[in-house]
Amino acid sequence: MFKWLLKHHNQPHSLQLGLLDQPLPFWKPFLLFLPALLTTILFTIIPFFLSLQKGFSANSDLYDLSSQSFSLRTFQDLFSESNFVLGLRNSFLYSLISLPFSIIIAIVIASAIVFVYKKLLRGFWQTVFFLPYVTSGVAISIAFVYIFDSASGILNTVFNVNTKWLDSGSRDTFNALWAILIFGVWKNLAFNVLIISTAMLSVNPQLYKVASLDSANPVRQFFKITLPSIRPTLIFLTTLLILGGMQVFPLALFENKPEEAVANGGNSILLYIFQQIQSGNTNLAGAATLVLFVLGVCYGLVLRNGFYLIEWLQWKIKQLYVQKQLTLY
């Protein structure tokens, strides 16, 4: 009897349990989740289905749902638009080129923060590199406008060239794309460095100690321990960069004038959608939105599966190497 009383006396009561351990009615966590759910439904799901409906419809009236008819004519008109083709080219090239540069530069800087600087300075350097992320986007855009100014820009002055980056007057030029690319890589660098450096600091330090005992140099430890350990983080960042790259919106570099961006080679899919909505061409805007969605999904699937394909090829190469070594003995 005494043991039973002692056992039940030591058990925690409901008031002593943590918040996550206490039984809660369904409506309490649902109320916390409800704002995010409503935001997603109102600003993501409903607009997506409206875009789907307008992209395959021949009726240009956004609110007239009674006379809708299925048609692919909108997509035919879309791909015959030269502005859309140029925007598609710029968005795809931006996403393709900015992805490796953003990841590689962020990995190098994060490695320097984690492995070079002392522990007391890690937080300081993380804060320094994260400052651009919290800086006003308008201020950053104005700074880059001065950097790429063709008359007295910093870039042309330093390299003693006269390249017209943002005011070339040609829709087909790649000069504006390079300016947008540099601006985008720098803008995303702060967030990427913070995420990758945090992932590197979470790697088990015992792995490095064991590797040091096995005479593995820091470079080998980086490629054999650090990179495989942060692979989920790299896949996550890759997905974000793909989506962000396809949705590039360089309007701020052209003084918020869509016509200036298009006339000087700074068009993109998202900018094209913005222009069509301003003009009231909801069918073309909906079709372009669907094309952007399909391209983003396909591009993301190809790159994500590429990671697994590379791992599978590495495993097969190691397997063949081991089998070859066994046959020699």
From Swiss-Prot:
It is found in: Cell membrane. GO terms for cellular component: plasma membrane. The keyword Transmembrane applies. It holds the Pfam family BPD_transp_1. It is a multi-pass membrane protein. InterPro entries: ABC_transporter_permease, MetI-like, MetI-like_sf. Signal peptide: none annotated. Its main location: membrane. Residues 88-303 form the ABC transmembrane type-1 domain. Keywords: Cell membrane, Membrane, Transmembrane, Transmembrane helix, Transport. The chain crosses the membrane at residues 30-50, 96-116, 128-148, 176-196, 234-254, 283-303. GO terms for biological process: transmembrane transport. Probably part of a binding-protein-dependent transport system. Probably responsible for the translocation of the substrate across the membrane. Belongs to the binding-protein-dependent transport system permease family. MalFG subfamily. PANTHER family: ABC TRANSPORTER PERMEASE PROTEIN, INNER MEMBRANE ABC TRANSPORTER PERMEASE PROTEIN YCJO. This is Probable ABC transporter permease protein MG188. It comes from Mycoplasma genitalium (strain ATCC 33530 / DSM 19775 / NCTC 10195 / G37) (Mycoplasmoides genitalium).
